[in-house]
């Protein structure tokens, strides 16, 4: 019986291995073909890996070309009842309203479609996408299009136009290959494994260009943080990354060795200790946007190498810092709305919280509120620490209320607690939604006030 069960699995494994081998052979063939094209270019005296663009008028970003013709956007055409949805009105342009202005553009080739004497080439640069309209009678290098593959980088010069279907395009008059791509471009369907996407972000950016919004948002956030703190008299500093002592948090550090000094060192888990020393030295307002390292678990939401910000202010209470943190987050949000309006609108639509004045709740009270809201009993922390916990029943109740709780790590952390205060802090980490916390447990941190 077991052998009969194994046979379908064996056949499936064999099929997957065969498909992988066929895909590898197909890719090798494709790479060989592209290398042959590069060789032909060299034979003609052309460099398939140029490090310059043609001298002359400057390159125009593709989004700027679209922006130039905002006034030529066409209204949506009425559709027959039951007709399939067409291109959105925002992407349709009136051919009579698009002036034949000259542009020089460059970007990565996303697709090439040929229809006899006309070839359409879609380009992408860092700002967006645009189509090239390549006509045999207008483009001097029309025959060279045979050497263009998906993923290649090209530059083109021509005039703006709109096709009969309302697609804004550049009617190409000159075209030049800048860089030949040997490997085929990944697609959303061929590159969708979450772990692979996080490990190879550069490939993910090609297959899923919307991911670039995350990078742009991070840049805007860091700039806004600096702007906010600098305007309030804080001094940005850089402190050592390698420490002789482990401090600033309770996380496990990465270890390294200094050969010249024969000294064991630790990559910092937080910049706290040196920032406090600077306050002692007389800098009353300091901050650092620091790269930190914690030798612990990892996931798509938890990276052992990460960036954090810490700021310290003399003559201020923790209530003062709460006010400052609220104002900082609102400032960052406003800057994101200015720099990335489309992405920001989408993020706001997904929010389940407000950036107005935050709730300031004692830690124990916050846990009680969260448990009640999730349909859970008030003694969850005590029972989970005592191994008297109907986890499946609780998980079902929490999920019904819209909450997802990491019960495995919650239970593991609760069992390690040596005092009621530590148990309260552990429960807070896994149960409570983010808000500003008062009455921090002294057992859980040396920065709390007894």
Predicted regions and their residues:
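Class II aminoacyl-tRNA synthetase-like tRNA-binding/catalytic domains
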Residues: 2-7, 12, 16-27, 32-320, ...
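Metal-assisted phosphate- and nucleotidyl-transfer catalytic regions
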Residues: 247-253, 331, 335-450
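Short, contiguous, pocket-lining structural segments
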Residues: 217, 266, 317-324, 358, ...
């Amino acid at each position: 019986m077991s052998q009969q069960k194994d046979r379908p699995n064996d056949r499936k494994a064999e099929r997957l291995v065969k498909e992988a081998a066929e895909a590898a052979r197909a890719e090798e063939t494709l790479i060989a073909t592209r290398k042959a094209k590069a060789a032909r270019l060299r034979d003609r005296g052309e460099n398939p890996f140029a490090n310059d663009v043609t001298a002359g008028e400057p390159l125009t970003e593709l989004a700027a070309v679209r922006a130039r013709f905002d006034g030529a956007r066409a209204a949506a055409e009425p559709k027959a009842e039951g007709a399939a949805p067409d291109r959105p009105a925002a992407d349709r342009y009136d051919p009579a309203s698009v002036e034949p202005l000259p542009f020089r553009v460059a970007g990565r080739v996303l697709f090439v479609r040929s229809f006899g004497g006309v070839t359409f080439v879609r380009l992408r640069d860092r700002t967006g996408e645009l189509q090239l309209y390549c006509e045999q009678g207008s483009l001097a290098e029309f025959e060279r299009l045979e050497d263009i593959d998906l993923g290649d980088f090209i530059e083109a010069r021509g005039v703006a136009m709109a096709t009969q279907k309302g697609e804004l395009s550049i009617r190409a008059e000159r075209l030049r290959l800048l860089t030949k791509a040997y490997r085929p471009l990944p697609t959303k369907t061929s590159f969708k494994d979450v772990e692979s996407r996080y490990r190879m972000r550069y490939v993910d950016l090609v297959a899923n260009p919307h991911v670039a919004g995350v990078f742009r948002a991070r840049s805007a956030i860091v700039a806004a943080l600096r702007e906010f703190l600098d305007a309030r008299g804080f001094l940005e500093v850089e402190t050592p990354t390698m420490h002789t002592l482990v401090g600033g948090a309770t996380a496990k550090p990465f270890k390294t060795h200094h050969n010249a000094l024969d000294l064991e060192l630790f990559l910092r888990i937080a910049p706290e200790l040196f920032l406090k020393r600077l306050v002692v030295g007389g800098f009353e307002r300091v901050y650092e946007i620091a790269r930190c390292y914690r030798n612990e678990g990892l996931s798509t939401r938890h990276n052992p190498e990460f960036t954090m910000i810490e700021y310290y202010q003399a003559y201020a209470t923790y209530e003062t810092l709460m006010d400052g943190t609220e104002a900082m987050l609102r400032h960052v949000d406003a800057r994101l709305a200015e720099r990335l309006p489309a992405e920001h609108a989408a993020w706001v639509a997904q929010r389940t919280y407000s950036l107005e004045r935050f709730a300031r709740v004692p830690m124990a009270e916050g846990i009680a509120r969260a448990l009640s809201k999730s349909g859970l009993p008030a003694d969850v922390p005590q029972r989970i620490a005592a191994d008297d916990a109907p986890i499946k029943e609780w998980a079902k109740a929490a999920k019904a209320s819209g909450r997802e709780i990491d019960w495995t790590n919650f239970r593991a952390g609760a069992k390690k607690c040596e005092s009621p205060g530590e148990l309260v802090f552990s429960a807070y980490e896994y149960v409570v939604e983010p808000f500003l916390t008062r009455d921090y447990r002294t057992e859980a941190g040396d920065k709390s006030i007894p």
